[in-house]
């Protein structure tokens, strides 16, 4: 086990004193790193995610290179779907493609339940490898939220408008709610296994839920999110982060959920979130596109986010979405260093 562990992010969430604002980046592990690209010359994505030693190496890289205050497990949100009977393929340049999309309640009934130790042992072995031997910061495990997973399963892949997903909600509530309940059960088991293997925080990615209005979120999603988070927390007292894109209209609904940290994209400032009555620890929220700008521009955009975060008192610095491949590793290192220096208590 690691001694003198950097638990800044956990302290921030608990409301304890910290020496600086903690920082990590969504998608910090993977495609923007030259070491990862070199690895991809020899190994496929499947190889990297299914071999614990390789996956642990990729997960650990940003902590070494950028000095982040947390690591996030290098996996795909589709990981728990294949074992339950979803024929999913990750296609380069497209993303997840589902070859057996959900159309009827019979399709939902065909789905099996997940047994993480049997079905995804490589996930748990990666976590154990990181937490038992190497990592000096908390490890974030994660899952896709039921709506976001369902949208892929119904649409058959990425979508811009989620027409088929919404149509199922409106036209066939029995199938919709059966799918939601099944995905909550899967996610609870998957996340619980990650925590029991050594993950110290969980982030739920509800990437596409911003496609829904408030009324539909309350009816079709919120009860299932409450059950998912409550059941996980009922088993383990683990901090839960929730993040989605373009979902600022749902911010008060999210604040009602039993989460610990609310992730903001770049469209809503920390001050605006406070004015809307958000009481959770806030995470975010630099527009990742700014990372392609000159350093003086990046620095000027960082300051108001960090100032508002320090004024709020409960802030984890992150981007408003994931790191993309064109971002230079040196830029991420400088951002992390600037956050640590600028917010030094």
Swiss-Prot record:
Q: What does this protein do?
A: Catalyzes the decarboxylation of four acetate groups of uroporphyrinogen-III to yield coproporphyrinogen-III.
According to its UniProt record, which protein family does this protein belong to?
A: Belongs to the uroporphyrinogen decarboxylase family.
Q: What EC number(s) are associated with this protein in UniProt?
A: 4.1.1.37
Q: Does the keyword Ion transport apply?
A: no
Q: Does the keyword rRNA processing apply?
A: no
Q: Which Pfam families match?
A: URO-D
Describe its assembly: Homodimer.
Designated name of the protein: Uroporphyrinogen decarboxylase
In what pathway does it function?
Porphyrin-containing compound metabolism; protoporphyrin-IX biosynthesis; coproporphyrinogen-III from 5-aminolevulinate: step 4/4
Report the catalytic activity.
uroporphyrinogen III + 4 H(+) = coproporphyrinogen III + 4 CO2
Q: What class of enzyme is it?
A: lyase
Q: Which residues bind substrate?
A: 27-31, 46, 76, 152, 207, 321
Keyword vocabulary terms for this entry: Cytoplasm, Decarboxylase, Lyase, Porphyrin biosynthesis
Molecular function terms, GO-annotated: uroporphyrinogen decarboxylase activity
- The annotated site for Transition state stabilizer falls at 76
**Entry's localization field:** Cytoplasm
GO BP: any one term: protoporphyrinogen IX biosynthetic process
Gene Ontology CC terms = cytosol
SUPFAM superfamilies, A to Z: UROD/MetE-like
